[in-house]
Amino acid sequence: MGQKKNLEAAQLAAEFLANEVPVAAICGATAGLARAGLLDKVLHTSNSKDYIAQTGYQGAPFYRVSPTVRAGGLITAPATNSLEFAREIFSCLGVYSDEVLAGWYNLFNTGDARYFAD
């Protein structure tokens, strides 16, 4: 049942990307995209190069060691960078202005309440 659901999710992600609908994957979700071939020809990141290589995917030349990678409508991140991942999603979707997004990120990154007013 789990593998079937993963395949369905990957197929939906492929449809979204083909229709220019953003897709975001963090931690193990990047492995699901890799298994489906969705990371074979696009810049991406994951938990580590060795982690994602276990999927047998062909995208190693496109792997980047980075807190997040945004390639068109595809956003990927390792498990350790959930804050940066959220910031990239908000940026992609245009949820906040650049100024408000910077304040939001700084508040959660530092815990300094002065950024709340920004």
Sequence positions of predicted segments:
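Active-site-adjacent pocket-lining segments in enzyme domains
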Residues: 1-118
